[in-house]
Regions:
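Subset of Sec-pathway N-terminal targeting signals
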Residues: 1-42, 166
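Soluble non-transmembrane domains of integral membrane proteins
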Residues: 74-312
Length: 312
């Protein structure tokens, strides 16, 4: 994590804390929005790769094909429990390192329980997706191979490395690096060996299902629920109403994408913004608001991204 990444996280906090205050003070009353009916399911991600300011679209829930290793039986799930000075986290081998629990040591809910930012809706986080050469969507959500740190308290940075075999001898690897005194988790993805099997040569990594409310008065928390993308000095956001579903995709270099609640945020910050092909944000509101974000990256290069999961 370099100085530019630290600066990016600082700017994210400044933008997201002060933008709502500015809008409340200076923005005119919004005109009623005309909402088109859409069918995008938040749990299946975003239609990445569209042009900027993409309109809402109607689409059927896509069938998601799970890749399995052609040479190995399905692997059993492994759970790696980590304790840092700031939080306790549990990482699953599903999807090559999805975070299935993330509870803070210094933040508590109305029942005096540690705030946990992971629930049943957003367990599909940090997942990698792409289309095969036939254009079929691929979700690498099964268990990946892992033989490393078994869990426990960490006093220095600890890297968890996962891999999955797409075809004989061709692997995708993903690593997550944790630090004892930071909410930042560094992510590295190497898909170079499978780039010939990736349609358009790009894959996505994203966070789906947003963050749960943590306030006793959930309605007050929901006011702040949004997803954001920051490109070229411009901030775009998605805020949905009950019954709505919306997604927007933006081509080109991306500084960061984020999902926030009143007090917490999850954000993906590419180490090299120019490496990003496009970014997408969106959300749906049926039983509750849930927001998504993802970035599209080239399989031809190793990609390094920082995840911030913590307080604003």
């Amino acid at each position: 994590m370099d100085r530019n990444t630290l600066l990016a996280f600082f700017l994210i906090a400044i933008v997201l804390i002060f933008t709502p205050m500015y809008m409340e003070t200076f923005s005119p009353s919004p005109e009623p929005a005309i909402v088109e009916d859409t069918g995008l399911d938040s749990t299946h991600g975003l239609p990445i790769g569209k042009k900027p300011n993409a309109t809402k679209t109607v689409k059927q829930k896509p069938e998601v094909f799970q890749l399995t290793s052609p040479t190995k039986a399905d692997l059993e799930e492994k759970l790696i429990e980590l304790e840092t000075n700031l939080y306790n986290a549990t990482v699953s081998t599903k999807g090559g390192g999805s975070i299935v629990s993330f509870s803070f040591k210094n933040y508590f809910d109305q029942d005096s329980q540690q705030v946990n930012l992971i629930n049943g809706i957003n367990k599909e986080n940090l997942s990698i997706r792409f289309q095969n050469l036939d254009g079929d969507p691929i979700n690498l959500g099964k268990n990946w191979s892992y033989n490393g740190f078994l869990g426990g308290s960490i006093n220095s940075k600890e890297t968890l490395k996962f891999s999955t075999e797409i075809s004989p001898g061709q692997f995708i690897t993903k690593s997550l690096t944790f630090r004892p005194d930071s909410y930042v988790i560094d992510i590295s993805v190497d898909a170079q060996k499978v780039q010939s099997q990736v349609f358009s040569g790009n894959y996505s990594i994203g966070w789906y299902g947003g963050l749960p409310p943590t306030e006793k008065n959930e309605k007050d928390d929901f006011v702040y629920f949004k997803s954001y993308v920051f490109q070229g000095g411009e901030l775009e956001e998605v805020k949905i109403k009950e019954g709505e579903t919306e997604s927007q995709s933006f081509n080109g270099s991306t500084d960061w994408v984020a999902i926030r609640t009143k007090y917490f945020i999850t954000s993906l910050v590419p180490n090299n913004p120019g490496q990003v092909t496009s970014a997408a944000i969106g959300g749906s509101f049926s039983d509750r608001e849930a927001y998504d974000m993802e970035v599209l990256l080239p399989a031809s290069d190793i990609s390094n991204i920082s995840l911030y999961l913590g307080p604003l």
